[in-house]
């Protein structure tokens, strides 16, 4: 609970506040120490189709903000804030960002500014490329230096977050072949809150379903881009997403050919992650599970080698709404504002 107001507090707006990602951002902000001591103030809450409703109609768990009225998502409403989170479908953030001050910290949870290659963007999204911003996955090499003090942040996609954290240490150390396979299962909240037939309870409960396979999914080029950034070799990615009957969580199983021993691979992961507050490299013989990370900003990672098949296996579990979206957004905000990176974020899940 916020106890007092502080002069020159950082005023934060959330666009797309009625959606799952927007609601999760607000949940984390309500638990942020800067909110508790008044250094952070939650300003405008906006949405496109639910303007005029109260936030409590969409997120009854956010009781401190339940009475707040959702406003239209317009630059006139979002202007005047120190930081703006954009939790919007792709194609919407770029237009809004152009209308906001260069001094405003804009944290885009959509896809508009993630890809650096205009041709790749146009191929997968079918619209003009708006450019690229610093990538909000601090654990990647060099990412923190780009995020500190920036005023524009592109939050990674949820699947790429899991895949990149699972794979980059091995690839950066040149211990696996640069042709990787990623099979990732996800809860339905990753598809957003729109009412579609495929997400009805009767369609989801008791059923698992692959979708957008064979290089079609829009997160495929984002995974490849992130992996290419840590090696001087070209990287190919085969990505298969699978929807499972759960509300949250991603479990990514990533494989690649290797001739390196497990001891050498584990050493690469220990070197990459030993000082990372949100990464838990599991002991040998233990495997990640989504239930252990739900509600947290943690990523649980395990590595193994199938010696008969000469195949490296890395498994990562994250909460798609926290480390996969809102947690990465808040973590990146902390870095951009010069606050402790871990503020407002937990490594403790809520399992079972």
UniProtKB/Swiss-Prot annotation:
NCBIfam families: argC. The lineage of its organism: Bacteria, Bacillati, Actinomycetota, Actinomycetes, Mycobacteriales. This is N-acetyl-gamma-glutamyl-phosphate reductase. It comes from Mycobacterium tuberculosis (strain ATCC 25618 / H37Rv). The active site is at 158. Pathway: Amino-acid biosynthesis; L-arginine biosynthesis; N(2)-acetyl-L-ornithine from L-glutamate: step 3/4. The keyword NADP applies. GO terms for biological process: L-arginine biosynthetic process. It catalyses: N-acetyl-L-glutamate 5-semialdehyde + phosphate + NADP(+) = N-acetyl-L-glutamyl 5-phosphate + NADPH + H(+). Keywords: Amino-acid biosynthesis, Arginine biosynthesis, Cytoplasm, NADP, Oxidoreductase. It is an enzyme of class 1 (oxidoreductase). Was identified as a high-confidence drug target. Pfam families: Semialdhyde_dh (PF01118), Semialdhyde_dhC_1 (PF22698). Belongs to the NAGSA dehydrogenase family. Type 1 subfamily. GO terms for molecular function: N-acetyl-gamma-glutamyl-phosphate reductase activity; NAD binding; NADP+ binding.
